[in-house]
């Protein structure tokens, strides 16, 4: 059907409103587009900054010196009951030790030629060679008088730790990283078990990891080095570890404490192995022993031995006060052990080759809690 043309006057009356509506629609579109662009700018403007911060975070996390720095991430923890005199950061520590423990061998795995393990708790010493140190003690194998040592350990720490600092405060490392523990649940060891291993999930590195994690959880920025300084050759291991520590100190001058974490080796003439043990909160742990060197004026040059001794005493006092029976007496002797590098350099023996790995892992956690208390002012 053919449409009729509208009269001119009527057609003009429809066209004008249509053009006005079109103009209004166009204006609204322009306004909407401008508003959308402004909103997008507001949303996306922070993204370059966020991307930069993310990249910097990744770069910081990936930074490592050539000696394989590993900054241990702290495990999840929840508040636990603790002595009110301890720093809040230590009171809040639980750090589920179950997260670290390994399956141990049962009796069905015991070989016919298995060796014997003898458990023993080493008490604190008494007599002229021993200086009381809180609930603990110091065994004096030097010519320093007991009165001199007793007076020295009453002095404050020669350094202060910065809690929650972005800069490393503590270095955990291992001169004899390949030292390991027995893997049996019973009091026996297979030939070769509890001697040496390059497996860092089984040797001293595993214990050091627990120590570092616990300190980090307490707000003490801690690095953990897993260099196998005694592999492939045991000879020269202290020269190797000295170079490693010097590299860390040059890169991170904020480090105040260097812990060389080892295990002991105590056995009978017949080859049976002693396991230094104690019980803490219903769980068996390896006992620990701090070794602090002294300058003898000739072959052992440790001009800062007094500062290290103060640190050893504070740590011993803290650990034995928190966990009675956990420590053996501090060994104060003419030993070098690279303890000239800082005023907070110590060696700690965590158990011995007669202990199983789980006892040592638990001891590492307890030792670190005691250290955190000492460093944060709760000793």
Question: Residue ranges of each PLM-predicted region?
Answer:
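N-terminal Lys/Arg-rich, disordered targeting/topogenic segments
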Residues: 1-15
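N-terminal catalytic or cofactor-binding beta/alpha core of small enzyme domains
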Residues: 20-256, 265-270, 365, 373-379
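Structural recognition of the beta-strand scaffold that forms the well-ordered cores
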Residues: 171-174, 222-224, 257-260, 289-292, ...
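Solvent-exposed loop/turn segments at secondary-structure junctions
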Residues: 177-180, 228-232, 263-268, 295-298, ...
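A short, glycine/acidic-enriched catalytic loop
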Residues: 190-194, 266-304
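Alpha-helical scaffolding within the catalytic cores
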Residues: 245, 270-278, 330-336
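Active-site-adjacent substrate-binding region
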Residues: 304-331
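Active-site-adjacent mobile loop/cap segments within catalytic or ligand-binding domains
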Residues: 325-379
């Amino acid at each position: 059907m053919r449409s009729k043309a509208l009269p001119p006057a009527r057609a003009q009356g429809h066209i004008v409103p249509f053009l006005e509506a079109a103009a209004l629609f166009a204006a609204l579109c322009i306004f909407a587009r401008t508003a959308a662009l402004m909103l997008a700018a507001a949303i996306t403007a922070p993204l370059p900054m966020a991307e930069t911060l993310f990249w910097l975070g990744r770069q910081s996390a990936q930074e490592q010196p050539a000696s394989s720095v590993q900054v241990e991430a702290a495990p999840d923890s929840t508040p636990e009951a603790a002595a009110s005199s301890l720093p809040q950061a230590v009171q809040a520590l639980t750090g589920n030790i179950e997260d670290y423990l390994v399956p141990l061998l049962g009796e069905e795995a015991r070989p016919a030629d298995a060796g014997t393990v003898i458990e023993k708790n080493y008490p604190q010493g008494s007599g002229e060679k021993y200086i009381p140190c809180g609930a603990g003690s110091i065994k004096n194998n030097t010519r320093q008088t007991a009165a001199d040592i007793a007076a020295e350990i009453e002095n404050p720490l020669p350094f202060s730790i910065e809690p929650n600092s972005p800069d490393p405060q503590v270095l955990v490392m291992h001169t004899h990283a390949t030292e390991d523990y027995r893997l049996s649940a019973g009091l026996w060891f297979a030939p070769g078990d509890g001697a040496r291993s390059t497996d860092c999930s089984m040797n001293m590195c595993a214990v050091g990891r627990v120590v570092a994690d616990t300190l980090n959880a307490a707000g003490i920025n801690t690095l953990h080095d897993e260099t196998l300084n005694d592999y492939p050759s045991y000879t020269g291991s202290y020269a190797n570890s000295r170079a490693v520590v010097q590299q860390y100190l040059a890169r991170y001058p904020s480090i105040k404490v260097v812990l060389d974490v080892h295990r002991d080796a105590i056995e009978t003439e017949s080859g049976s192995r002693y396991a230094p043990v104690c019980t803490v909160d219903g769980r068996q742990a390896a006992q620990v022993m701090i070794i602090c060197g002294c300058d003898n004026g000739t072959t052992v040059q440790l001009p800062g031995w007094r500062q290290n001794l103060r640190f050893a005493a504070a740590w011993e006092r803290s650990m034995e006060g928190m966990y009675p029976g956990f420590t053996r007496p501090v060994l104060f002797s003419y030993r070098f052990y690279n303890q000239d590098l800082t005023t907070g350099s110590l060696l700690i023996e965590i158990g011995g080759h007669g202990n199983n790995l789980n006892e040592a892992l638990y001891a590492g956690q307890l030792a670190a809690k005691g250290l955190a208390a000492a460093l944060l002012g709760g000793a």
